[in-house]
Design a protein with these regions (language model features):
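Residue-level recognition of tetratricopeptide repeat
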Residues: 77, 111, 143-146
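Structural marker of alpha-solenoid helical repeat scaffolds
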Residues: 73, 107, 138-141
Length: 161
């Protein structure tokens, strides 16, 4: 009797294990070029805050390449154009950074990030009148971006980025 119970128990265990061994695992999620770029930008900002500017620059360049790929696969996305403007500006190309920001604003005129970053670009290129126009758009958003841009325009704060 004990022998029969033992055999039944063993067969049950083996049957259970064989089913679990054959089950398919869930496929791993593949990160988009955009998601990889955003991650690279986060790292670049951390490096920049620590004064590791060469590492930051490499991360911005990597992010820019990923964003260009993302933009070619899925064009006219305001968030992608915002980050393209940002990385291009961070790499010192203000002219093309501005073009990306303006393309993004053509799609989404009240985009908070684009308006703030474009305002910062205008301050950096001594075009305060245009920076104030961006500030005016952010005026009613009740957001941190408005406060930061205002302080940067007023000269009471230096741009973090």
């Amino acid at each position: 009797m004990i022998k029969k119970l033992f055999i039944i128990l063993c067969l049950t265990l083996f049957a259970t294990n064989s089913f679990s061994a054959g089950s398919d695992p869930k496929p791993a999620k593949v990160k988009t070029d955009y998601a990889k770029a955003v991650e690279s930008i986060k790292w670049a900002k951390k490096y920049e805050a620590k004064g590791k500017l060469e590492k930051a620059k490499k991360r911005y360049a990597k992010a820019q390449k990923l964003l260009l790929k993302s933009n070619s696969k899925k064009p006219n996305q305001a968030d992608t154009l915002n980050y393209l403007g940002f990385t291009t500006r961070k790499l010192g190309d203000y002219e093309n950074g501005e073009k990306y920001y303006l393309q993004g604003l053509a799609i989404e005129p009240n985009h908070i990030g684009i308006n703030e970053y474009l305002g910062e670009l205008y301050v950096a290129t001594n075009r305060l009148d245009l920076a104030k126009e961006r500030l005016k758009i952010l005026e009613n958003c009740n957001c941190e971006e408005y406060k930061e841009l205002k302080q940067i325009i007023d000269g009471t704060k230096k741009s973090k980025y």
